[in-house]
From Swiss-Prot:
Cell membrane keyword on record: yes
Cytoplasmic-side positions: 1-8
Taxonomic path: Bacteria, Pseudomonadati, Pseudomonadota, Betaproteobacteria, Burkholderiales
Protein name (database record): Cytochrome c-type biogenesis protein CcmE
Function: Heme chaperone required for the biogenesis of c-type cytochromes. Transiently binds heme delivered by CcmC and transfers the heme to apo-cytochromes in a process facilitated by CcmF and CcmH.
Domain of life: Bacteria
GO molecular function: heme binding; metal ion binding
Subcellular compartments: Cell inner membrane
Originating species: Bordetella bronchiseptica (strain ATCC BAA-588 / NCTC 13252 / RB50)
């Protein structure tokens, strides 16, 4: 029969092992659910993954929005004023989606060079843009530094 001290040590070691296993599972789940953000310039420079999900952010180019006859399928272009990424999306758009306004689309790049969006996020205020999109546009020289408000990171 194990001594009291031996049982306690075994119990503590088992608890630490279970805690380490739980932490490893949580970290693995978080890593597999990460969706990275890229500007259109970075997408064209092949910095974005060729397979897997990522986000593209910028402005919806004026005059680029085309709706299909079904009313749900949409094609438009996201630009950082330097480069452009064509986007195809099927679904309901946010009410604030507009040409010339900020947008972040999540999805993956098709073999034909068209980004297949599974989610479209539009800005929610006339002075707001997601921080990553604002930074990408500033780097491209499309936005003055004080034009937009962004969330605290």
């Amino acid at each position: 029969m194990a001594t009291r001290r031996g049982r306690r040590a075994l119990l503590i070691a088992g608890g630490v092992g279970l805690l380490a296993l739980a932490a490893a599972l949580v970290l693995n789940a978080l890593r597999s659910n990460l969706v990275f953000f890229f500007s259109p310039t970075q997408v064209h420079a092949h910095e974005a993954p060729s397979s897997g999900s990522f986000r593209v952010g910028g402005l919806v180019r004026a005059g680029s929005v085309e709706r299909a006859a079904d009313g749900l399928t949409l094609r438009f272009v996201v630009t950082d004023t330097v480069r452009e990424v064509p986007v195809a999306y099927t679904g309901l758009l946010p009410a604030l989606f507009r040409e010339g306004k900020g947008v972040v689309v999540a999805g993956n790049m098709g073999a034909d060079g068209v980004f297949r969006a599974t989610e479209v996020l539009a800005k929610h205020d006339e002075n707001y843009m997601p921080p990553q999109a604002a930074d990408a546009l500033r780097q491209a020289g499309a936005l003055p530094s004080a034009t937009l408000q962004t969330e605290a990171r």
